């Protein structure tokens, strides 16, 4: 089996996934994108495709239910707010400037708190970016095709020897 071909199939999947995240505005700091690494492992003719990435990919993929809104996810927010530190970082990275309300400009911390309450209440809708990447790159079919080619090569070798 050509491991390089399998690596290329995996890399195509990863690039498509990164593209979908970018196209859908799911890149702020780039931490998730930079964490994505793929690997094909081979052990005694057992092929394993591994994608390592930050844990929060699953929330972008599957969404998170809010305390007031069910987004059909297996994950749910329990409290009234989510991690305000992460929201503050997101505000800073995105360059979001709070607008004046009643001649008072909220601090980044205050804005993060309001946003975190909204996220906890409404949840996060899943984007299914990895699943969509799997489908659009024909990942499974491409792997099956590569293994089929290898099986045909092996069958031809056997039949040539036995003829």
What is each stretch, according to the model?
Residues 1-46:
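Charge-rich, low-complexity N-terminal segments
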Residues 31, 35-163:
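Charged, low-complexity interaction tracts
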């Amino acid at each position: 089996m050509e491991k390089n071909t399998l690596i290329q199939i995996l890399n195509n999947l990863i690039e498509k996934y990164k593209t979908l995240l970018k196209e859908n505005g799911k890149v702020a700091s780039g931490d998730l994108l930079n964490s994505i690494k793929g690997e094909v492992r081979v052990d005694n003719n057992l092929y394993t495709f591994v994608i390592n990435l930050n844990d929060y990919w699953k929330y972008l993929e599957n969404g998170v239910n809010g305390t007031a809104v069910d987004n059909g996810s297996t994950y749910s927010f329990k409290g009234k707010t989510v991690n305000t530190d992460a929201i503050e970082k997101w505000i800073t990275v995105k360059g979001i400037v709070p607008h004046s309300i009643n001649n008072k400009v909220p601090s980044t911390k205050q804005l993060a708190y309001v946003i975190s309450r909204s996220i906890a209440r409404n949840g996060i809708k899943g984007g299914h970016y990895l699943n969509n990447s799997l489908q659009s790159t024909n990942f499974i079919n491409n792997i099956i095709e590569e293994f089929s080619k290898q099986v045909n090569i092996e069958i031809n070798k056997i039949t040539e020897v036995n003829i």
